[in-house]
Each structure stands twice: as C-alpha cells, then as structure tokens.
Amino acid sequence: MKRMVSWSFHKLKTMKHLLLLLLCVFLVKSQGVNDNEEGFFSARGHRPLDKKREEAPSLRPAPPPISGGGYRARPAKAAATQKKVERKAPDAGGCLHADPDLGVLCPTGCQLQEALLQQERPIRNSVDELNNNVEAVSQTSSSSFQYMYLLKDLWQKRQKQVKDNENVVNEYSSELEKHQLYIDETVNSNIPTNLRVLRSILENLRSKIQKLESDVSAQMEYCRTPCTVSCNIPVVSGKECEEIIRKGGETSEMYLIQPDSSVKPYRVYCDMNTENGGWTVIQNRQDGSVDFGRKWDPYKQGFGNVATNTDGKNYCGLPGEYWLGNDKISQLTRMGPTELLIEMEDWKGDKVKAHYGGFTVQNEANKYQISVNKYRGTAGNALMDGASQLMGENRTMTIHNGMFFSTYDRDNDGWLTSDPRKQCSKEDGGGWWYNRCHAANPNGRYYWGGQYTWDMAKHGTDDGVVWMNWKGSWYSMRKMSMKIRPFFPQQ
C-alpha cells in the first residue's frame, strides 16, 4: 500500500512538470508572434485581447454580397508571335528568384501579415484551450496532491492504530495465558482437593445434625410436662417478702407468698440483702435462658424459672429468669405505697440502679397502666424522662410513665398508626409499657457480649435488654432485675 501511494504521487508530480513546460513553450511562441505584430504590422492588424480587462468582441451580421454584372469578357490573348514583354519585379517585394519567370522569392509584408493572421486564430484558440487544460490539470493535480497527502496521513494513522491494536492484542494474549496458567495450576488441581474437604465437612455436619436432632427429641420429651423446682421451700411465709423478713426469713431464696386469702400462695424470689432486704423480685434477666417474646396471657400469668439450686445447696438460693405476672404485680402494688428498684450490670461487671419511690400497676381492665415517681439512682431516669440522647418530641415518645402494657398480640403502645406491622412489642422483642417505642427495654432480646448492631436484630431495631440513659440503644445488658417492696420510712 505504501509503495503504491508513493509511485502514484511521483507520477503525478512528473506529469505536472511536463504540463508546466509545455505551457511555457506555447507562451514563448505566442509572445514571439505578438512581438512581430508590433514591429511590422500596420494599424490594421488585430489587437490582442486582454481577457482579464476586456470583453470578447461579438460578430455582427454581415450584409449579403453584391449581385449583378461583373467585368466584361477578357480580351483574346495576343498571338504567340508577339514579342514577350519582360516583367520586372516590383521594388516592394524582397529578393528575386533565380528564374525571372518565378517572380519574387520572398512575399511582401501584407502577404506575410495575412498568412500569419490566418495561422494566428487557430493557434490562439489552441493556446487558449491548452491554457484551460493546463489550469484544469493544475487544479486536478493540486486536488490529487492534497488527497494523496490526506491518504498518506490517514495511512500513517492507520498504521499507528494497527500497531496499538497489536500491542493490546499482545497484552490480552499475555493476560489470557496467565489466567490459563493460573487455572491449570490452581483451579484444576485444587478443585478435587476442595471437593474432598467439603465432603468430609458435610459428613461431619450430618453427624452433628443427627446428634442435635436426637438431643432435641430428648429435650422435647423432657419438656412435655412443666418444669418443677426440686428444692425445699422455707416454712415462713407472708403477704410479700417484706413481711417474710419481718417474720425472720433473712436468707435470699425462693419463698411462698399470699397477698390475699382469696388467691393461692405462689412462689417468688426474695432478695433479703440489697438495701436492707425485703424485695420481691418481679423480673430477672441473667443468661438468656428464657424467651421473653411472649403473648398477652403468659405475661398476665407469669412465666420462667423463679429460682435454681445450682450452687449445690438444698434450697433455691439463686434467682432464675422469669416474669412474675401482671396480675400478681398489679395486686402487690395496689396493696399500698410501693417502691421499685431496677438493678443492671454490663458485661464488664459495672453496676448501676434506678430507684422509684412510687410504683403502681393498674389491673387488666386498665391495661396494666404504669405509674412511677420519685426517681433517684445512677442509671438515669429513663421511665419518667425518656431517652437522654433525644430532644423535644422525640424524647417525649420514649417516656414510659403512664403507658399501657403491650405484647405483640395486644397492641396498646403509643405508636398510633394504621399499619399493623408498626408495633413496638413486635419489633422490640418483648412485652413492656411501650410508648413510641422505648428508653428502657428490660424484656427485650438477650444478646451475648453487650454490643449488637441493626443487622443482628430481627427487625433492624434496638430490641436488646436496653437502658438507653446508661449504655445507649445498641448495648444489651448482661443482667437486669426489677424488685418491689412496700414503701416505709427508713430509720
């Protein structure tokens, strides 16, 4: 391609030089004719036409030739016997011919002028035509020259693109070779090994699943009947734990209480050590062994394990995870002035508490409405003031005082919406006196380790065992308990 373009370019250049040489020859010849006209022709000769300044003359219509009679008949020639008259060449002519009969050798100026004029017209036309042809050829040559330069530039660009494409192809080829080598060395050789490992893991998991299924079946069989506490219960009893301590029950363990003679006695855990004792534990969280995400009736009646004897003693000296029951809590708090103590512990062992001098829970007809007052403590007044991290109406939405009790099947919270999915108890993991929604959530889901995130939560909400005024929304307590006792002046 490059050789062909170079040969065509050389050929056009040679043709251009030949045409320019031919034009110069005709111009010189034409100039010589004009010079002779100026030196020898009379005023009757034509004037050269300046095409740039003058218009070409137009031919006028010629009149018809004159008709009619002409000369009379020529006289008869003289006889041959007559004496030949010698003709003498006129002076106007040039040199004489060697034979006198042939006359003048050179023509006169008028004859030469006329002959030249007869030849000048076709030559002039030819010269004009050649000039036009030369100009057209020159323009064509210039266009061809420019086109050839354009082709040359395009060809050079194409050559560069081809070279760049070759480099890209080489790079991709090298990359493909590397990938092919990697596949051959790693994937093809490792896949069989990985498959064997996965088969081994699968078999191991299958055996573990079978063992778990066996354990679950045994546990389900064991839990077909309600769990019973196999430990001794003290003989001393009373209306609540405060009356028991006054009767001499001084150890913290499980007791039987009977607030009213119309109800059967029931088990509670009495804390006889904290702040002079006499506390009836109505709620306790410590290890996540009991699910607090329950319906209205279980919260009404109570659930969980009141106490355990895992310390090796013959009595239940340690509290379990349980909720005493809303009916029982309501009855105990409506017997007289009652105080509430909420204790909590984080996963580092740090402890805080919130004490309320007044605490009352209404009956079921009033949806177990809560009332608290007279706060003191180190945990922060979450029940009365709401979450300290929030401001304005957002904080007001987290106040629990005065709220009704809610479970996921009985929506009594302060989140007023037509969407049944937007329910605090359903999103926050337990039954509680929710507003919209909480600053405290003692009955929430139990998270090991304390810190948890929204993607760990079932609904993406802060549904842990939370007390926002101490640890914020995304920290679930290790332990939390709620204890009540009749209010009396301390000595």
Curated annotation (Swiss-Prot):
Range of residues in the leader sequence: 1-30
Result of changing residue 44 to C: In Christchurch-2, Seattle-1 and Ijmuiden
Domain called Fibrinogen C-terminal: residue spans: 232-488
Site (Cleavage): 44-45, 152-153, 160-161, 163-164
GO CC term, one of those recorded: cell cortex
Main localization category: secreted
Coiled-coil stretches: 157-222
Recorded superkingdom: Eukaryota
Tissue localization of expression: Detected in blood plasma (at protein level).
Alphabetical keyword list: Adaptive immunity, Blood coagulation, Coiled coil, Disease variant, Disulfide bond, Glycoprotein, Hemostasis, Immunity, Innate immunity, Pyrrolidone carboxylic acid, Secreted, Signal
Post-translational modification summary for this protein: Conversion of fibrinogen to fibrin is triggered by thrombin, which cleaves fibrinopeptides A and B from alpha and beta chains, and thus exposes the N-terminal polymerization sites responsible for the formation of the soft clot. The soft clot is converted into the hard clot by factor XIIIA which catalyzes the epsilon-(gamma-glutamyl)lysine cross-linking between gamma chains (stronger) and between alpha chains (weaker) of different monomers.
GO MF entry, a single one: extracellular matrix structural constituent
Effect recorded for residue 95 to R: In CAFBN; hypofibrinogenemia; heterozygous; decreased fibrinogen complex assembly; no effect on fibrinogen complex secretion
Sequence segments annotated as region (Disordered): 44-75
PROSITE patterns in alphabetical order: FIBRINOGEN_C_1, FIBRINOGEN_C_2
Result when mutating residue 383 to R: In CAFBN; abolishes fibrinogen secretion
InterPro entries in alphabetical order: FIB_ANG-like, Fibrinogen-like_C, Fibrinogen_a/b/g_C_1, Fibrinogen_a/b/g_C_dom, Fibrinogen_a/b/g_coil_dom, Fibrinogen_CS
UniProt key word Coiled coil: yes
Stretches with biased composition (Basic and acidic residues): 47-57
Residues bearing the modification Pyrrolidone carboxylic acid: 31
Mutagenesis / variant outcome for changing residue 430 to D: In CAFBN; abolishes fibrinogen secretion
Domain statement: A long coiled coil structure formed by 3 polypeptide chains connects the central nodule to the C-terminal domains (distal nodules). The long C-terminal ends of the alpha chains fold back, contributing a fourth strand to the coiled coil structure.
Subunit structure: Heterohexamer; disulfide linked. Contains 2 sets of 3 non-identical chains (alpha, beta and gamma). The 2 heterotrimers are in head to head conformation with the N-termini in a small central domain.
Name of this protein: Fibrinogen beta chain
Protein source organism: Homo sapiens
